[in-house]
Amino acid sequence: MAGLFGSKKDTRPIDVGLASLVGSDEPTAIEFWKKRFEMTAAVPNDIARVGALTPQMRELTRIDNLEERKRLTRARLIAFTKLAPEQRQLITAARRKAFDVDRGVMEADQKLVDELLPTLDASVRSAYPQA
């Protein structure tokens, strides 16, 4: 039996801002992620920071084109290193806690991070937290 609204899958983006980045240039994507991280770090509650970060990770995993997902993840990794150290700490803590919220999404993201990180500049690699 279909649900109240039928069995059609909802294909609307979870995060419209992130979805709009598909096809953008790298500087635009990096600036987007930097701004998003700054806003997330500014959230005054750790649980709310996790709640802000998790949908962004979900939206990334919904991008079917693997090369585009890699490109946006790469931009995210670069943007992370442009944050102030205290902002990086807050984002890192939220990301760790997000594994308890949606382990499948976060593990898929971590797999991509593990693949991309070695290809990035040493300054990016050294600033990104290792598990």
List the model feature ranges, each with a label.
Residues 4, 10-78, 82, 86-131:
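General marker for long, soluble alpha-helical cores
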